[in-house]
Amino acid sequence: KMLGVVAKKPMSDYE
């Protein structure tokens, strides 16, 4: 999910 980029969260959120 690209949510990590928008929410500025760690890359772990990508999985």
Swiss-Prot record:
It comes from the Eukaryota. One of its GO terms (cellular component) is mitochondrial inner membrane. It comes from Thunnus obesus (Bigeye tuna). It is a single-pass membrane protein. Pathway: Energy metabolism; oxidative phosphorylation. Component of the cytochrome c oxidase, the last enzyme in the mitochondrial electron transport chain which drives oxidative phosphorylation. The respiratory chain contains 3 multisubunit complexes succinate dehydrogenase (complex II, CII), ubiquinol-cytochrome c oxidoreductase (cytochrome b-c1 complex, complex III, CIII) and cytochrome c oxidase (complex IV, CIV), that cooperate to transfer electrons derived from NADH and succinate to molecular oxygen, creating an electrochemical gradient over the inner membrane that drives transmembrane transport and the ATP synthase. Keywords: Membrane, Mitochondrion, Mitochondrion inner membrane. Belongs to the cytochrome c oxidase subunit 6c family. Its main location: mitochondrion. Component of the cytochrome c oxidase (complex IV, CIV), a multisubunit enzyme composed of 14 subunits. The complex is composed of a catalytic core of 3 subunits MT-CO1, MT-CO2 and MT-CO3, encoded in the mitochondrial DNA, and 11 supernumerary subunits COX4I, COX5A, COX5B, COX6A, COX6B, COX6C, COX7A, COX7B, COX7C, COX8 and NDUFA4, which are encoded in the nuclear genome. This is Cytochrome c oxidase subunit 6C-2. One of its GO terms (biological process) is oxidative phosphorylation. Signal peptide: none annotated. It is found in: Mitochondrion inner membrane.
